[in-house]
Amino acid sequence: MQETGSPLSNSKSLPERREAITDQQVLIVGGGHVGLSFALLLAHHGIASTLLEKNRYPTISPTDDRTRSHYLDSRNTALSRRTVQIYQEIGLWDELQSHACRIDSVQISEQGSFGRAQLNKVEEKVESFGQVIENAWLGRKLLLAAQQSPLIILIDNASVNTVAQQADGVTLSFSSDGEAENEQQLQASVLVACDGRDSTVRQLLNIGTTTYDYQQTAIVGVVETDRPHEHVAIERFSPAGPLAVLPLTDPEGDGNDKYQHGYRRSVVWVCPTGEETKYLEDDAQFLQTLQQAFGQRAGTFVAAGRRGAYPLSRVLADKQVEGRCVIMGNAAHTLHPVAGQGFNLCMRDAHVLAQMMS
């Protein structure tokens, strides 16, 4: 990997790459899952792009599948069938599916209420309802694919300073390591901002937002149960907040092989803000509380991994297009995770925009 702050594409020498930057049709700010996916969608249509990411990308070996990084996230994402189809279209799904677990059935219930709703892939006549994938694996494969594409130039450790629009394009200035003397300028026909909920580009364009604080926090982690998941996703509504338990693949098996203490599942539990500490500190207490809220639908919870807490709010950009700039991903709309559609909505936006630009 090249030194931080330089383009990462290995198809050209550094001077050639810097010269090529000025010829790019599209600038993308934000190199997370949405930004990388959009760059790959553009490349699929033969459109060149330059992507700026404020963080340092991790060093990844294409031959070492065990590589992980905190940058690539320790959470899991439920991919809809449409999102899976999009990755199939650009030829990436074969690389992703070894760490993805399909959802064949969905169960929905409410604590203290009789009955439940259940969806089954056979009855609905679909291959599956989607896939649950490790964010670390998804990010790793997206980054490797972007680094290997001759149509994508990656620049990491880059902070955007200014955005100026002209009749026929956009000029953006950025600096490395946050130092003004390192400032550089890029030009392109279109700028697409995928730089997250607190988007710098959105703020520089003076695009306002409508924000709602749910006063809730999502507790996210991985647990193990004594019963195989059988590719069932379960959503349980409890007084403490909605709780989802999703099937996960075993890193060394097919998702139903026993792993360490039991069978792996992803947990997303929404609780009132201020109560998250009790879900994070003591594993035994967390498992006991989880068992009480969930019952035996997934079997007995026997182990818990490290958990993270993520404050929840809804953020909607007042507009998603301003001149030659497009706001996309969480910069455009950050949603509550209860339906698991945030990333999938972003992917639909990215797919449609790439098609329009082609």
Regions flagged by a language model, labelled:
Residues 118, 238-311:
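Conserved FAD/dinucleotide-binding core of flavoprotein oxidoreductases
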Residues 277-358:
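FAD/FMN-dependent oxidoreductases across multiple families
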